[in-house]
């Protein structure tokens, strides 16, 4: 893909990984250095933290689908710019259409604002369900935020527990 300037600095396109029939999909912001190097989302420090949370909740990484808003690493881990997001949004829409998740967990502000709308803020929205077009969305902290502020880990786990409770209600 060469739809935006991120193609000039990336090593790999980091498309997405996981169960293509997953009931739960996680959407983050964009790849970091480790993800860019390995070509897979959430394999760096934030990914390890996410895997730990999965373990606590009894989720297997292979059971969910994990993607990002942008598929190439923004330089210096900056937030993706609007033109970069717009270049990738159709890829993300197609991923959602193919996977058909019942629940989408939005990891952080970039995912939240670009999927549900600019009027949403992560601090006010996290932990609260939003329904849109038949899909339930759970906004929560991005795992990288937990690395900067340990106190957010409790909220993150609580939000994922809400996801698991809702998933259990849906499958019963």
Regions found by a protein language model. Give the residues of each.
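A polyanion-binding, active-site-adjacent surface
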Residues: 1-172
């Amino acid at each position: 893909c060469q739809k935006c300037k991120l193609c000039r600095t990336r090593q790999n396109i980091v498309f997405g990984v996981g169960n293509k029939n997953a009931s739960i999909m996680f959407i983050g912001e964009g790849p970091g250095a480790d993800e860019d190097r390995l070509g897979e989302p959430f394999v760096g420090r934030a990914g390890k933290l996410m895997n730990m949370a999965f373990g606590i909740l009894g989720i297997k990484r292979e059971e969910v689908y994990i993607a990002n808003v942008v598929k190439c690493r923004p330089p210096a881990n900056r937030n993706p710019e609007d033109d970069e997001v717009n270049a990738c949004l159709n890829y993300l829409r197609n991923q959602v259409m193919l996977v058909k998740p019942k629940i989408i967990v939005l990891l952080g502000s970039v995912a939240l604002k670009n999927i549900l709308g600019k009027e949403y803020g992560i601090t006010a929205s996290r932990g609260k369900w939003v329904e849109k077009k038949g899909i339930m969305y759970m906004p929560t902290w991005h795992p990288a935020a937990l690395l900067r502020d340990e106190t957010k880990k409790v909220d993150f786990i609580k939000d994922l527990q809400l996801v698991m409770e809702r998933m259990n209600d849906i499958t019963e």
